Amino acid sequence: MEKQINYEKRRLPVPFDSGLMYTVVAIYYVYAYQYIAKFNFSTEINLVLSQVLFLVVPPLLLALIKKYDIKETFRLKAPKPMEVLLMLVISPVMVIAGFCAGFIGLLAVKGIFGRVYIAGDTTDLMSNDIIISLLLVAVLPAVCEELLFRGMIQRGLERIGAGWSIFLSGILFGLFHFDFQRLAAQTLIGFLAAYVVYRTGSIFNGMILHFSNNGLLTIFANYMAGSEVQGAQVVTDPFDVPEFAQIAAQYNISTEQLLGIMAAVFAVFLAISVAVIFGLIIVLRSITRKTVEKPDKIKGSGKGMLIGLPGLLMIGIVYTGLGLMLLNNNMGQKILQFMGML
């Protein structure tokens, strides 16, 4: 039995706020980042400043200006022990699903564009001291990104329905990572985190999932030797390494055939992981059926989301630049340089 949320009494966001936030943060994050870079801070400091100033401050300011209920808007409710336990069970399965989707996405991007785009700054951060890496790549995004997407944006979108809020916030979250090959994986994480936060009413459960995903990937990257990438760059073939060639030669097959077999295996593991996650979601629905709060929908309120179109346009321009650069078109690099992404 879902409880009804009284939006007027609690003063919670509406779709207009979600769209406004996405546009403001997208423009702020994409364009204003280049001004922080002019101070010549380290990559670590740049990341902290961009996450806090661009992802946390705007939604908090909007909530304060419009006098929204901070605790309810951002779902600052302590998670129940059973919920935390379930998050810890879901997390590794989600990481496997995300890794499989990411590998398949990498192959897809290489197949479509012939090359892939590697974000070197993130790779460098993951290869840092393990504690610093976890703080910067796992803890910081888990807190800042969740407050924006599962806080202000998702809460506002709930006025058009819980299902739409989960779907749209997940899509917006995936797009915001500006990465073709990770788009599917990040969107999957966005859907799952959005659903978990909605069902449990606690943003901290979303943070646990987010931290677990980034944290495990960071640990993997931290202990991988010889794979450092300095700066963002285009790589023609990320699989053109001795290890792949040796494995292919061992089984008397080509590297392309090896990658095809790996893609099929990863697809199977992805399907199994998604099935397991679906089963765990059923368990989550069961333990939250008496506590989940049903949002109060308002007919026509979705029109307010149109203010988010400039933000989507901004992100679309970035993806266009990335695509053109992968196609070896000089216009792509010019677009990304103009946007402050290079």
Question: Where are the regions a protein language model picked out?
Answer:
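Membrane-helix interface linkers and caps
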Residues: 2-8, 33, 44-92, 107-112, ...
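Alpha-helical transmembrane segments in multi-pass membrane proteins
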Residues: 24-65, 267-271, 334-342
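Hydrophobic core of alpha-helical transmembrane segments in multi-pass integral membrane proteins
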Residues: 24-33, 56-61, 266-286, 310-325
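Membrane-interface segments at the starts/ends of alpha-helical transmembrane spans
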Residues: 39-44, 123-127, 238-267
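Juxtamembrane helix-loop-helix connectors linking adjacent transmembrane helices
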Residues: 41-46, 71-144, 324-342
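Function-critical hydrophobic alpha-helical transmembrane segments in multi-pass membrane proteins
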Residues: 56-57, 92, 97, 119-183, ...
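Functionally important transmembrane alpha-helices
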Residues: 175, 184-250
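C-terminal regulatory/interaction regions
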Residues: 295-342
